[in-house]
Amino acid sequence: MKKIKYTPDAADKLRALKSAISQEYGEDKAKKIIKSITDTIKGLCDYEEKGPKVSKMFDVVSDYRYIFVSRNYVFYRIEDKYIRIINLYHEKEDFMWQLFGIDTTPQDTIDYWDE
């Protein structure tokens, strides 16, 4: 069975998420959400292909897969010995821009906000 390995970015993001939730909603809520995320990630050991391939969903060249849990996208890669957690992004974050440099802002939004 493969082990889960977190990149430093993913581990930092998980800690920051716990801190932000604790400040906003309290420690108990933060623990519950982080447990939900980490339990779902641990479940990848039983079924590593649970998440769809990013390349099939978004037409980008990538070996990443992702799962969606507790309003967060968790990106991971299947390796020989590990399932590597690359990073996680809240559903409101533009992960396509942050991961792949792909701008997903629709033209009408750009026009409206004059960006």
Indicate residue ranges for each PLM-predicted region.
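Generic secondary-structure boundary/loop-capping signal
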Residues: 1, 51-55, 61, 86, ...
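Arg/Lys-rich, positively charged N-terminal/basic patches that mediate binding to nucleic acids
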Residues: 1-36
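Residue-level recognition of specific faces of alpha-helices
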Residues: 13, 36, 40-43, 66
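A general secondary-structure boundary signal
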Residues: 30-34, 38, 62, 78-87
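Basic/aromatic recognition patch in beta-strand/loop cores that engages polyanionic ligands
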Residues: 47-83
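Enriched for short, Lys/Arg-rich terminal
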Residues: 72-73, 77-115
